[in-house]
Amino acid sequence: ELLVKNGVKFGEAVWFKAGAQIFSEGGLDYLGNPNLIHAQSILAIWACQVVLMGLIEGYRVGGGPLGEGLDPLYPGDAFDPLGLADDPEAKAELKVKEIKNGRLAMFSMFGFFVQAIVTGKGPIENLYDHLADPVANNAWAYATNFVPGK
C-alpha cells in the first residue's frame, strides 16, 4: 500500500480485497498464469487449507521429530530452538512477552480489518486522510454513518 501511494504500480488487488479475487469471473490465477493452479472454488481452497494444515499439525502433535520433548498444547514451547537463552527465568519472561506481542499484533490487524471494512481504504491511506483532516476522518465521524435513522 505504501509503495502504491508513492507511485509504484502493482497489478494485484488491495490487500484487504485480495480474497475477493476468487469470486471474479476469471477466478484466482497464481502468479498471473492461468496454466498453473486455477482456483475458482472457495470450498476447494478451504478444503486444501484444512487438509494441509491438518497434516502439519497432526505431525507436530503426533510426535514428529520437530516436536519431540515439547508440550503439544502449550503455545510458544519451541520458543528458543537454537538454545540461545541461558537463564531459565529470562527465557520464561521472554516467552510471556512474545505471546503478549503476538496478541497485540492480532488486535492491531483486527483494527486494520475494521478500518478497511468501514472506509474501504488501507491503514496507510487512512492515516494520510486523518492527518490531512483529523476532524472529518476519525472513528467518531465514521460512527455517525451507522446511526439508525440517518
From Swiss-Prot:
Chlorophyll a 6 binds at H130, A139. Chlorophyll a 3 binds at Q21, L31, E98. The lineage of its organism: Eukaryota, Viridiplantae, Streptophyta, Embryophyta, Tracheophyta. Chlorophyll b 4 binds at Q49, R60. It is a multi-pass membrane protein. Belongs to the light-harvesting chlorophyll a/b-binding (LHC) protein family. Chlorophyll b 5 binds at Q49, F146. InterPro entries: Chloro_AB-bd_pln, Chloroa_b-bind. One of its GO terms (molecular function) is metal ion binding. Keywords: Chlorophyll, Chloroplast, Chromophore, Magnesium, Membrane, Metal-binding, Phosphoprotein, Photosynthesis, Photosystem I, Photosystem II, Plastid, Thylakoid, Transmembrane, Transmembrane helix. It is found in: Plastid, Chloroplast thylakoid membrane. It comes from the Eukaryota. GO terms for biological process: photosynthesis, light harvesting. Chlorophyll a 5 binds at K97, Q115. Its main location: plastid. This is Chlorophyll a-b binding protein type 2 member 2. Photoregulated by reversible phosphorylation of its threonine residues. The N-terminus of the protein extends into the stroma where it is involved with adhesion of granal membranes and post-translational modifications; both are believed to mediate the distribution of excitation energy between photosystems I and II. Chlorophyll a 1 binds at R103. Binds at least 14 chlorophylls (8 Chl-a and 6 Chl-b) and carotenoids such as lutein and neoxanthin. The light-harvesting complex (LHC) functions as a light receptor, it captures and delivers excitation energy to photosystems with which it is closely associated. The chain crosses the membrane at residues 36-56, 104-124. Chlorophyll a 4 binds at N101. Chlorophyll b 3 binds at S41, E57. The LHC complex consists of chlorophyll a-b binding proteins. Chlorophyll b 2 binds at I37, L66. GO terms for cellular component: chloroplast thylakoid membrane; photosystem I; photosystem II.
